[in-house]
Amino acid sequence: MDSKESLAPPGRDEVPSSLLGRGRGSVMDLYKTLRGGATVKVSASSPSVAAASQADSKQQRILLDFSKGSASNAQQQQQQQQQQQQQQQQQPQPDLSKAVSLSMGLYMGETETKVMGNDLGYPQQGQLGLSSGETDFRLLEESIANLNRSTSRPENPKSSTPAAGCATPTEKEFPQTHSDPSSEQQNRKSQPGTNGGSVKLYTTDQSTFDILQDLEFSAGSPGKETNESPWRSDLLIDENLLSPLAGEDDPFLLEGDVNEDCKPLILPDTKPKIQDTGDTILSSPSSVALPQVKTEKDDFIELCTPGVIKQEKLGPVYCQASFSGTNIIGNKMSAISVHGVSTSGGQMYHYDMNTASLSQQQDQKPVFNVIPPIPVGSENWNRCQGSGEDNLTSLGAMNFAGRSVFSNGYSSPGMRPDVSSPPSSSSTATGPPPKLCLVCSDEASGCHYGVLTCGSCKVFFKRAVEGQHNYLCAGRNDCIIDKIRRKNCPACRYRKCLQAGMNLEARKTKKKIKGIQQATAGVSQDTSENANKTIVPAALPQLTPTLVSLLEVIEPEVLYAGYDSSVPDSAWRIMTTLNMLGGRQVIAAVKWAKAIPGFRNLHLDDQMTLLQYSWMFLMAFALGWRSYRQASGNLLCFAPDLIINEQRMTLPCMYDQCKHMLFISTELQRLQVSYEEYLCMKTLLLLSSVPKEGLKSQELFDEIRMTYIKELGKAIVKREGNSSQNWQRFYQLTKLLDSMHDVVENLLSYCFQTFLDKSMSIEFPEMLAEIITNQIPKYSNGNIKKLLFHQK
């Protein structure tokens, strides 16, 4: 029997072979055959059995596995075998090598066979090889019968087609089974990808594949179902897939719009899709969506991969959340809300689905697509960054009504403990920034003593002023005062309080002014003629810090001499102790001078020269002040543990020097010099002697000196008030400053003598010895110019 006659029974329409393949033989449409499609006409150029036997060496054998795709009971199997034996005895044996080869999905025209379905990820069954002598199919029938005995009938019967690449049973191997043609045709029309026509390959009594209608297969994925069924009803969608020469275009590339969303393949065990309205699309087992791959006009292919963003190098593109065709700004009911992604500006966004049913799925990923640069892209990007019109909100600020709850259970991203608000919006949300303390930069609690300060600096300033503490900085009077280090150096903190303008009398003055205003208001109500008159205080205290206030802060503390009074006194031991004490006092004087406002602006050489010329002035005047304050000018208080009384003054070489020093304390006692006056006079003594050739910064020096002369006048006015005795007192104080030159000259002459006379064996500290060594030549040459207030 000819192969054409076996494949094309009488009374059936034939389909031209040009629809299936061109040029190189034909391939049987396995998909249509299983669905009852059109008959296939095999051309005469098909390879013969001999050709198939010659290609046996290049092909591998295949094991046909129907155990997971079909099942029947033992009784039906026996009936099938009996019917097959009867048909073989009654009818002559046809040459079905070509038909069987084609029905198994093998292209016998080429040695390289192509098994359909491997590109889609389905399990490959292998390749079929036919030997030249295997024209009898009894072994095949026995293997199929044995496999059918071991299989069981699965539940939920549904019609499906075998996977491409698996061999299909022939007419001799299965009995004929009758079915309803109308229902069968209706089922074919309802399935996507089928022929859907009324043309059948065989008649009812000659149909080879009607047995498939009685077989029940699972419609699920082979890898996901328990039975691992390889039969799929919707594997081959396009009929051109069976022919490699059907068209020039790649059958796997489908047309799609640029802005169309690319949906991933959703299997039965994966999460559902989301519609534009936020509803869940439930995928049925019979309609399993295949992965779609779209082609565009650009030179790249956009693949749909869940949770993966494809980035291109050819142009500026950006990632946009997929909203199923809706605009990211125009449609407020978008499917994805963005919040929780950290950016470089400190803002945080998170990605959540706008569906209440998906809020419980923590691992749900949004679908993204790569959008090529379009004219609207820059506008959307600017809107996402917060620019644009006021009625448009950014992604981070979107709060849709359809989103009932976020994936983490918080109703808004602001309630998340791990989400911090942007720094730029903190000030606008909480109002103006808090006011800071002008001393330590802490948060200010109010205006205290005329300055906006915190409570800690307020208490510190009050205690420092009322306690009359003489703080001394251990550094260079430039310590950093902030919230953390404000307690390290009280001297620098007190100085900064004065620089900020804190004044203890500001609070009292404020109360006085308030009381005066209340009294004025009461008097104005009683007498109408005084209603237009206002009472103004005579002089308001200056709230800005004065130089005298700064001088109070930087005043050095009193040093101890470490003299042992239990040991009998001697002139040598007292003078040696005084020299050691003088060396430490010189060091403190250097620190004090550098802290004087304006002194460090001078040239460094000028600073050293002024200190070398004035060190004895500073020590003698400070000694007179301590003696005046502690002993009323009758004793010399060098240190709290070293006081020169009348008995010690009688020691050899002590009386003449003590007499000059007592003169200073006596004058201070007579004039009743105040502390502010003393500070200004001490600063002027630092600036009382200069070289004859002048200083390198002479103009600045004269300006600084004149400034402190005016400060001395202010201190006098503060002490005496507005009286005619101010100029007289100024004359007396400046006269005392001029007399200091004579006292210091006598003290220096004795100091130089003891320093040069090695027989006296009086020790000098290193720093003091260096100063004396540098100063002796200048005094001997007369290279010193005295700055006097009055002429002799």
Curated annotation (Swiss-Prot):
In this chain, composition skew of type Low complexity spans 75-94
Other remarks on record?
T-cell is a critical cellular target of GR, as immune activation in mice lacking GR resulted in significant mortality. This lethal activation is rescued by PTGS2 inhibition but not steroid administration or cytokine neutralization.
Which family is it part of? Belongs to the nuclear hormone receptor family. NR3 subfamily.
Q: Where is the composition biased (Basic and acidic residues)?
A: 1-15
Segments of the chain annotated as binding DNA: 434-509
| Domain text | Composed of three domains: a modulating N-terminal domain, a DNA-binding domain and a C-terminal ligand-binding domain. The ligand-binding domain is required for correct chromosome segregation during mitosis although ligand binding is not required.
Annotated InterPro entries: Glcrtcd_rcpt (IPR001409), NHR-like_dom_sf (IPR035500), Nucl_hrmn_rcpt_lig-bd (IPR000536), Nuclear_hormone_rcpt_NR3 (IPR050200), Nuclear_hrmn_rcpt (IPR001723), Znf_hrmn_rcpt (IPR001628), Znf_NHR/GATA (IPR013088)
List the NR C4-type ZnF regions, as residue ranges.
437-457, 473-497
Reported tissue expression: Expressed in spleen, kidney and liver. Expressed in a circadian manner in the liver.
Which locations, inside or outside the cell, does it occupy? Cytoplasm; Nucleus; Mitochondrion; Cytoplasm, Cytoskeleton, Spindle
GO terms assigned for molecular function: core promoter sequence-specific DNA binding; DNA binding; DNA-binding transcription activator activity, RNA polymerase II-specific; DNA-binding transcription repressor activity, RNA polymerase II-specific; Hsp90 protein binding; identical protein binding; nuclear glucocorticoid receptor activity; nuclear receptor activity
Q: Which residue stretches belong to region Interaction with CRY1?
A: 547-712
This protein's name: Glucocorticoid receptor
> Where on this protein does the Glycyl lysine isopeptide (Lys-Gly) (interchain with G-Cter in ubiquitin) crosslink form?
435
